[in-house]
Amino acid sequence: QQAYFPVPFEALQGRIDFLAMDKDHRIGNAVIRTMPGVHPGGVTIYRVDYRGAAAVFCTDVELDLMLLSGGVDQPQQGRSFPPELLRFLHGVNVLVVDCQYTDELYLQRRNWGHPSVGTVVDLAAQSQVGRIFLTHHDPDHDDEVITAKIDDAALRLSMLSPHGLVHGAREGMVIAVDQ
């Protein structure tokens, strides 16, 4: 039991298997890779490559704290990301990513474990991601605020990259990951 996850592990029901992810793992034709992110208590970013297509699941990762330079409080500097993060995301077809905060709100919520929309979009553009699905929105935001954030992200991406589309993820959504 930890401060950010109040349910004791022993209370979880069902069969739970653990797999050390210190190297790539193959399950059938899929290759699963991981890299550490930044979040209180730790977090892992997952990439699945399957038959020429790739998807990354990146939630509860405070990408702003992974920046080498730039960020919401230094708008005059471009955001600079670690090369290993850019390589990990490079050319993926789908990025499902935490996008809890606007750039303005992030300044008030630094170190809470979630990124700013500007950092998410800049990372996607620099990594040449195909489609971005924004998720894990601030629970205080209503549909209007979330829609505006998604629209702003789409506009920003269109100015930074000739490719890439922004979508709002929603509960029950099924995403086809193809080339």
Say what each PLM segment does.
Residues 1-69, 142-179:
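Binuclear metal-dependent hydrolase catalytic cores
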Residues 65-164:
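Cap/insert and terminal regions of metallo-dependent hydrolase folds
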